[in-house]
Amino acid sequence: GVTSNPAIFQKAISTSNAYNDQFR
């Protein structure tokens, strides 16, 4: 889960934000 892998969760958010920047 998120609590078990905060680093992976953080990376997923960073990747999602990167995609959002491309579409805007």
Swiss-Prot record:
Q: Give the UniProt entry's GO cellular component terms.
A: cytoplasm
**Annotated GO MF terms:** transaldolase activity
**Gene3D superfamilies found in the cross-reference section:** Aldolase class I
Q: Could you tell me the EC number(s) of this protein?
A: 2.2.1.2
Query: Which enzyme class, named as a word?
Result: transferase
**What is this enzyme's catalytic activity, as reactions?**
D-sedoheptulose 7-phosphate + D-glyceraldehyde 3-phosphate = D-erythrose 4-phosphate + beta-D-fructose 6-phosphate
The answer on whether this UniProt entry bears the keyword Cytoplasm reads yes
Which compartments is it annotated to reside in? Cytoplasm
Pathway where this protein functions: Carbohydrate degradation; pentose phosphate pathway; D-glyceraldehyde 3-phosphate and beta-D-fructose 6-phosphate from D-ribose 5-phosphate and D-xylulose 5-phosphate (non-oxidative stage): step 2/3
Keywords associated with the record? Cytoplasm, Pentose shunt, Schiff base, Transferase
BP terms from Gene Ontology: carbohydrate metabolic process; pentose-phosphate shunt
Q: Does the keyword Transferase apply?
A: yes
Q: What is this protein for, i.e. what is its function? A: Transaldolase is important for the balance of metabolites in the pentose-phosphate pathway.
**Family named by the database record:** Belongs to the transaldolase family.
Please give the name of this protein: Transaldolase
The organism is Capsicum annuum var. annuum (Red pepper)
